[in-house]
Amino acid sequence: MDRTRIVRRWRRNMDVADDAEYVEMLATLSEGSVRRNFNPYTDIDWESPEFAVTDNDPRWILPATDPLGRHPWYQAQSRERQIEIGMWRQANVAKVGLHFESILIRGLMNYTFWMPNGSPEYRYCLHESVEECNHTMMFQEMVNRVGADVPGLPRRLRWVSPLVPLVAGPLPVAFFIGVLAGEEPIDHTQKNVLREGKSLHPIMERVMSIHVAEEARHISFAHEYLRKRLPRLTRMQRFWISLYFPLTMRSLCNAIVVPPKAFWEEFDIPREVKKELFFGSPESRKWLCDMFADARMLAHDTGLMNPIARLVWRLCKIDGKPSRYRSEPQRQHLAAAPAA
């Protein structure tokens, strides 16, 4: 009997037709995907001379918004070394994005498999999957052009990646929190780089611009999905989710933002530099906290910021003020970056 009740509740949560505002939001996102979408091989002229990847191109030097780019150790390296490190770093960020979005696509396919006929979520999830497939091709093409043999996600996460999408069917709330935990750090980092206005290599600038433009819809959907589903959970479920939320944010952030072991060995970067960068210095801790201002806003708005959850956010070192609105620029951080 209990199992039947759980299945009925699960199926009822899949039906969203009774929420006109939510359905309208899904229609808006779906129409946005139709009207404004990108193809990695028609919207990026990979063969253009200006897109050529050449040695000693200073546009690959890491910007000040990157924690390594503003560190004295990096700035003390020769220009050639800075370029080499920058190319490897940016290629690995693209590979990490590729790996994460591959997991996301598989999860969305598992989630939509169980959707009832007529669900407006089905259409939008498929639009998002198509866009993410294009992103993975775009990221891989960038890695190929740069020429660095980068690993992407840490090995342990690559090994468990086939299991993660299986969560999307029975535990979609947990899955979409994981989606945000992966999307928010990448989106935050890329927006800061574009806002800084530094001269970037055209490949990197175009790839980032396309990704940020389409990722805005994906993050909006994940936020609205959770705003709709979280109130339907039982009190005990919301409590456990409130603890899972910050733990997932921090653990996936580490996997996505911190370069893999191969990076530190390849360039013989001192251990104390790594410690300062991730996240031993006050500046790096602020950068970490800033990434999750939108996530904290969502936790506040959905009642997940209870006293114990606040403690977990603090222990994870990602506590702080929530955003006033989504994608609010962290102006103090941006202002300080060029001076670093």
Curated annotation (Swiss-Prot):
On whether NADP is a keyword of this UniProt record, the answer is no
Q: What is this protein called?
A: Uncharacterized protein Mb0909
Q: Which domain of life is it from?
A: Bacteria
Q: Which cysteines are joined by disulfide bonds?
A: none
SUPFAM superfamilies the UniProt entry points to: Ferritin-like
Q: Name one Pfam family in it.
A: AurF
Q: Where in the cell is it found?
A: Cell membrane
